[in-house]
Amino acid sequence: TYNYSLTNNFTDINKLAQGYVFSNYNSLFSGNRYLENSTSQVHSLRYFKYNMFNFENIFATVSYSKQVDAIKNKSLLTGVNQVSSAVNINSAFADESLSGSGNYGRSFAKYYKANVRASLNWNKFNNIRVYPDSDANPNNNPTEIQTTESFNHSYTIGFSTNYKTIPNLGLSYNYSISDNFSDVIYTDSP
């Protein structure tokens, strides 16, 4: 099954109000009347098969999403004080995510089941970094787009019994890797 959606995302009306608003005792928010909606599109593909004769099941899904002209906050930190403003980020810096997973399982020898599972997830997010200058207005300070990426994948293999009158036993092993392009974390779990 393939699904596609295109959605317009509108901001909160408070972000459009011109002027400064106290968010906290040391935090101001400056509205931006020129904000526009952002657009997000999602593509997803799903497959499922189940066989009743050998209890085989196959499941797979893939999903991709992209948000264009996203509304981001840019914040200027001066000491413990903060002045924030919302802006539309350039469409060349779209937030994207891609995820996929698959599972295969089946019964064999009447009382035993085994399955294999894998999942992948990639994300790319763009944020605005504001550098301080001589004034406290975040709208005219030098900025830079910072891109953050992460890639996580996980693999699982499992085995279990399928008795009707005695207790069942299940064993599984999971191996996962989390990579945010500055640190890599490996996890083994029985």
What are these regions (language model features)?
Residues 1-190:
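Exposed, low-structure sequence patches enriched in small/polar residues
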